[in-house]
Amino acid sequence: MKTLLLTLVVVTIVCLDLGDSLRCYMGPKTPRTCPPGENLCFTKTWCDPRCSLLGKLVKLGCAATCPIPKSYEDVTCCSTDNCNRFPKWERSRPRPRGLLSSIMDHP
């Protein structure tokens, strides 16, 4: 009887511990379980010299505290599973220009 009770206690502790693990996106479609002590998900975005052509750079991940943004960065943090989805950009991207598009533009 004591063995059964001890087994139930161990299983309960393990299950409760797993329930506290936060899941965050680490890439556009890759959620992972955060390490112990990291209870926040974050999304960090910033521009580089190619930002006008390719859009902002994005870093997703887990953190113990919300990262402090540098002057050129935007950072958001949240604390529920998979709450840091890859951003959907509202800005339209320029149309690629090449031989085929030039022919299509001038029939």
From Swiss-Prot:
One Pfam match: Toxin_cobra-type
Residues spanning the signal sequence: 1-21
Cystines in this chain: C24-C41, C34-C62, C47-C51, C66-C77, C78-C83
Annotated keywords: Acetylcholine receptor inhibiting toxin, Disulfide bond, Ion channel impairing toxin, Neurotoxin, Postsynaptic neurotoxin, Secreted, Signal, Toxin
Tissues expressing this chain: Expressed by the venom gland.
Database matches in SUPFAM superfamilies: Snake toxin-like
Example GO molecular function: acetylcholine receptor inhibitor activity
Cell compartment(s), UniProt: Secreted
Entry keyword annotation includes Signal: yes
Main location: secreted
Domain of life: Eukaryota
GO CC terms: extracellular region
Listed InterPro entries: Snake_3FTx, Snake_toxin-like_sf, Snake_toxin_con_site, Toxin_cobra-type
Keyword Secreted included in the entry's annotation: yes
Role noted for this protein: Binds with high affinity to muscular (alpha-1/CHRNA1) and neuronal (alpha-7/CHRNA7) nicotinic acetylcholine receptor (nAChR) and inhibits acetylcholine from binding to the receptor, thereby impairing neuromuscular and neuronal transmission.
Family: Belongs to the three-finger toxin family. Long-chain subfamily. Type II alpha-neurotoxin sub-subfamily.
Protein name: Alpha-elapitoxin-Al2a
